[in-house]
Amino acid sequence: MSLFSAVEMAPRDPILGLNEAFNADTRTSKVNLGVGVYCNEEGRIPLLRAVVEAETIRVAQHASRGYLPIDGIAAYDQAVQKLLFGAESPLLAAGRVITTQAVGGTGALKIGADFLKQLQPGAVVAISDPSWENHRALFETAGFPVQNYRYYDAASHDVNRAGMLEDLNALPAGSIVVLHACCHNPTGVDLTPADWQNVLDVVKAKGLIPFLDMAYQGFGDGIDEDAAAVRLFAESGLSFFVSSSFSKSFSLYGERVGALSIITESREESARVLSQVKRVIRTNYS
């Protein structure tokens, strides 16, 4: 009997599986509405002028290809912090934010989930209903039980505000709550500033751990406007997690341009947290 005789065929990814089916389809009139990528009229992913210029500069430098630091390119990490929290954020000046480059937003979520499993091994993870499918898979793979909180009301095509707050209030202290910071995937229905304040109040009162996921900064109302939820939580004094992705922003889907940011209570705490996050990264892909 082969070592792999009992291995079952895994189901296709609900999103990327559609792309595989599209590529296998021989019809010339097909349209790909599966994977969320921007294509021009020829069906190709355009390369942004800024990316072309950056690549040209980079190639001309003939830079060496040595190992990056475990937490990635320092200038990139700092730029991510400024985009998320604002260049003048007191949190940055106080050293209360650590940021590590990640393999896309998925990689940032994976790092965060693995680190949280060390911190809160018995926690429950709550994700919105509906949510990006990989949220459940990532946290379940890390060993967490995952449940839903009500979010979208199909009848009104709006947020189920009462249901969401009721479900968050019912979570035990120490539960991890995954929140879409902007451009909710898959509904596109976002919380208002007042909604975010209500969610923050519940999170603080119940002692929940917020994990904000932001893959579309700038695609909603603007760069700063889309970061409003992150900055609101930053002003609250809470410790929390932010996974961010710029793969779509730069039209560099295959480059996996992500980052994980963690907000701590002090510069000294940041140093300890970063040391442990780097260990998680090292055992994943560094």
Question: PLM features: residue spans?
Answer:
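Short beta-strand segments
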Residues: 34, 180, 244
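Hydrophobic/aromatic beta-strand patches that form the interior of the parallel beta-sheet core
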Residues: 31, 126, 147, 211, ...
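Short acidic (Asp/Glu) and glycine-rich catalytic loops that position anionic groups and cofactors
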Residues: 31-35, 58-61, 145-146, 211, ...
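Short catalytic/ligand-binding loop motif for oxyanion handling, primarily in non-cytosolic enzymes
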Residues: 39-43, 186-187, 251-252
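Conserved core of the PLP fold type I
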Residues: 57, 62-207, 211, 217-219, ...
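N-terminal "arm"/small-domain region of PLP-dependent enzymes with the aminotransferase-like
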Residues: 2-75, 79-82, 86
